[in-house]
Amino acid sequence: MLRSSVLQGRHILSSSARPRPAPQWLARAGASSRLAGQRFFADAKSPTPVTPSSATPVPAETAAKSTAGPSATETPTPAPTRKTGRFRKFLIYLILTSGLAYGGGVFLALKSDNFHDFFTEYVPYGEESVLYFEERDFYRRFPNTLRNKNRLSPASRDEGSRVTIPSKSGLSSKEVEETGTDVSQPGPHMSAVTPAKADEATIKPAAAKPEEKTAAVKEAKKQAQEPEKPREEPKQEPKLPGSAPITTLEFANVSEGDEPIVQELVKTFNDIITVISADEDSAKYSKPVAKAKEELQKIGEQILSVRDEARRAAQEEIEKAHATFDESARELIRRFEEVRANDAAQYREEFEAERERLALAYQQKIQTELQRAQEIAEQRLQNELVEQAIELNRKYIHEVKDLVEREREGRLSKLSELTSSVSELETLVTGWREVIDTNLKTQQLQVAVDAVRSALERSTVPRPFVRELVAVKELAGDDPVVEAAIASINPAAYQRGIPSTSQIIERFRRVADEVRKASLLPEDAGIASHAASLVLSKVMFKKDAEAGSDDVESVLLRTENLLEQGNLDDAAREMNSLKGWAKILSKDWLADVRRVLEVKQALEVIETEARLQCLRVE
């Protein structure tokens, strides 16, 4: 008690003297609760009736004091009207409900494709919200995309530094010098001197594109104009008469000439040679051209070596991968063998346990059967003893009657004997009549069942067999088995009829064609998918039926084989295993086969019941 009081005092001292202002809605709630618990007095009292006994003379001082009392008391302030705030609550609930519904819609749109289409199309800002959460999910799964988003490749960064524009770019005028009759210049007269090289020089530039030729010519002109500066006039070198033109480079002479990069380099080099050959000072470029040829040869050799190294590295990687795959295959085979051995041991244990259980159950069943057989034998023995006692009693009575009759030698004894004989004969005739009636009814039932079956087999088109079925029901009487068999038949089967086996096979072939057309359709296929499946079904090859495969073509082939064998039950099971559009298209055919199977099964049950009744009579 002392500790609790001390703690309460410390808490009061530690708290601030100024009370903390409460929230507005809490203050209103507290004020309303305080006003509800506070008592108020009315300003004017209700008048009390004055009786003659209460009207007594009062002094003036007392009256003055009494009148001054009510005026001195303060009048209480009226209670403020309490605001309900219904609109505010409704608005808050509406905002919360809308937010929850919108959030639930976004969540369902992320999970379901159908609801995603509806939500993004009809709900305002639905597409932006779903896209925002999908991007968040994508960045959560692949965080490296944000890092590599603004990263550029080194090649793209270096492109700006590699591209340079020369100072004297563009075209400039130049006087054309007349060559005159210089035999050293290339022309038609050079074809007789070097026919093979001239052909190569004319064929190879023609293989290049016109744009490449134009670029090469411009580049050659710029290079030719650069040394011409006004500082000093270069000395004109004497022309070398009879200098041979520079020959172009063949693809076959370059290593790895079939590579696209090498071909482009050779084309560019040949264009440069063509431009240099067209120049008057082509002889002084022979050494750089020869050096460029050697560099091209080296480039081809380097490409060949790099490709060989890459091929060797790829071969080593392939060999390593083969070794890894072989090791994985051996490990998988080992695990498979272990699992198979474990499964075999487990199956063996389960088999032994099941065999012991079956043996125990069989022993118990044998003991039960033996006990029942013993009880039946004892009961039969007791019945035989009772019958023998009755027979002895009857013989005793008969002997007594014989003695009485012999003694009396009257007609009364003979009359009683005749009456008993007649009664026995009537009993015998009645029993045989019941046997004959039962046999006749059984035969009539069998004939009626055969009539229904023959009517179904002879009909080329589905024909109702209500009359035959009514005849079977009337002949069966109150047999519950026959009534249950007839009740199991679909009313549409005997009212409209069922197709024959040939009609079922013929209709199956038509249905199979439609199923093959729709075999490639998904469950939510549209018009384009239907058209594509129809076109592809025309070019599909038929294959043999496989026992373990569940594709549409194998199921159709197995069903057709079963129908040709007359096994409708297994054929219906095969067709029922289809899925998607194939099952939807074969639904009517399956319904017809089910009705046929139901009718056949009911007829077999009725026929079996008729045979059982015959055996019971016998």
From Swiss-Prot:
Role of this protein: Component of the MICOS complex, a large protein complex of the mitochondrial inner membrane that plays crucial roles in the maintenance of crista junctions, inner membrane architecture, and formation of contact sites to the outer membrane. Plays a role in keeping cristae membranes connected to the inner boundary membrane. Also promotes protein import via the mitochondrial intermembrane space assembly (MIA) pathway.
Topological category with respect to the lipid bilayer: Single-pass membrane protein
Alphabetized InterPro entries for the sequence: MIC60
GO CC field: MICOS complex
Name the record gives this protein: MICOS complex subunit mic60
Originating species: Emericella nidulans (strain FGSC A4 / ATCC 38163 / CBS 112.46 / NRRL 194 / M139) (Aspergillus nidulans)
UniProt keyword annotation of Ribosomal protein present: no
Region (Disordered): 44-81, 148-244
Subunit structure: Component of the mitochondrial contact site and cristae organizing system (MICOS) complex.
Keyword Acetylation: no
Residues exposed to the Mitochondrial matrix side: 42-89
Keyword list, A-Z: Coiled coil, Membrane, Mitochondrion, Mitochondrion inner membrane, Transit peptide, Transmembrane, Transmembrane helix
GO process annotations (BP): cristae formation
Low complexity bias: start-end ranges: 46-60, 67-81
Recorded superkingdom: Eukaryota
Stretches of the chain found on the membrane's Mitochondrial intermembrane side: 111-618
Membrane-spanning parts: 90-110
PANTHER family: MICOS COMPLEX SUBUNIT MIC60, MITOFILIN
Coiled coil: 289-403
Compartmental location: Mitochondrion inner membrane
FT transit peptide: 1-41
Homology family: Belongs to the MICOS complex subunit Mic60 family.
